[in-house]
Amino acid sequence: MQHGKHAITIDGVRQVFHVFGTGPLCLAHPGGPGFGWEYLRMPALEQHLTMVYLEPIGTGDSGRLPARRDYRLDVWARFLHGVAEHLGAPKVLVLGHSHGGFVAQRYALEHPDTLAGLILYATAPVLDADFWAAAMSNLELFPQQHPDQPEAAGMFGAYQATLAAPDDDAITHGLRRIMPVYFADYWAHEGRLAPVRAALRAWVDPLHGEEPAPFDVRRQLSSIATPALVLTGEHDFLCGPRWAAELHDAIPGSQLTILERSGHMAHLEEPEAFSRAVAGFSAKLPAR
């Protein structure tokens, strides 16, 4: 498959995706909702897999839906399926990060016959009041965890403001401001991570989708028969080991990997360890 940018039309809407790497196909759905796809690039993993990074509708050069309320998990899953069908592979490996993991779970439940494997990366099986209470409680501890970093003190308020951003420029600015909260220790690797931070982009409309009910698939996950890898960072304030354990316990035969020196962005914090975990899992899957 030719590397670089591709575009197709699904249900009358432009869907962009980007191809890099070599080996079996892996479709990767970024988080957010509304984050630009670029942060999810995984060069180390591209040595083992042909990575197909989706640029979700509502972001970047992909199309927009007529009404922002229509940005829902089932819609993103439908577009993910459209890309999989376009690629023509009988079965594909799907990786979902954070909110993209919600999309991947929905996809796995709706299209089990098209999956070769499922990688649930820094995500959770539920998005409810308890999830957010736990995340905000963890976030309040961030300044104490980084007492020598003045920037850490304002992160809780900055995070809340980012969630309430009124437009694309504001949410992009907010995301760049709060990026350190997604890492175990951003400042220890600032020289390497600062360019990623400066390049972050986000779009506000996908935040305003209206789900018919809060996301909660805990009772459905036992039906997933596809090989699954659940992976997160030990210091992920948002989708850490608690939620990874719930996913692992709920999905029969799943594998669990906790990266001890990572937060929410293990592919950037421990790229080699992350790549080994995913490539090792992929190598055990049936030929596809």
Question: Could you tell me what each predicted segment is?
Answer:
Residues 11-65, 69:
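Conserved HGGG/HGGXW glycine-rich cap/lid loop of the alpha/beta-hydrolase fold
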Residues 224, 230-232:
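Short beta-strand/loop motif that positions the catalytic acidic residue
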Residues 90-134:
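Conserved hydrolase catalytic core segment
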Residues 254-288:
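Catalytic active-site module of serine/aspartate enzymes centered on a nucleophile-bearing elbow/loop
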Residues 235-238:
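Acidic catalytic loop of the alpha/beta-hydrolase fold
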Residues 118-161:
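Flexible "cap/lid" loop of the alpha/beta hydrolase fold
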Residues 139, 151-219, 226:
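Alpha/beta-hydrolase
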Residues 53-99, 276:
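Active-site loop/oxyanion-hole signature of alpha/beta-hydrolase fold enzymes
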